């Protein structure tokens, strides 16, 4: 059975935030400290990112997206995505499949996201384009 996927409007965020925040924090744990859950909340509430949830009886997936208009191309970026149950890769695959039609309606020509290398198996249609290299400094 396919679960429901919904892109929430900003006035709906507070109704589901307590269920979504712990899921999103799982993704934040792998984001190298660039932002925290309060930053994510404000980016969504201020309209910079959209919050998507997948649910049946409860929320099983939460993710954020943003449409970015570059000078030559419009893309959908997925900054954060996580499932309540770490085994929910089927939900992740389903979310991408369901979002694709909406993305095209918005004029996006591509979808991009950062992921661990193992996700390549889940998304064989995506091309591995770059390797992110990072060096932390003592401050």
What are these regions (language model features)?
Residues 1, 54-58, 84, 92-104, ...:
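Solvent-exposed, well-ordered amphipathic alpha-helical segments
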Residues 1-13, 114-139:
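Terminal substrate-recognition subdomain of acyl/acetyltransferases
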Residues 22-35, 54, 71-83, 100, ...:
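Long, low-complexity, intrinsically disordered polar/charged segments
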Residues 46-87:
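Conserved donor-binding loop and adjoining core beta-sheet/short helix segment
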Residues 73-124:
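Acyl-donor binding region in acyl/amide transferases
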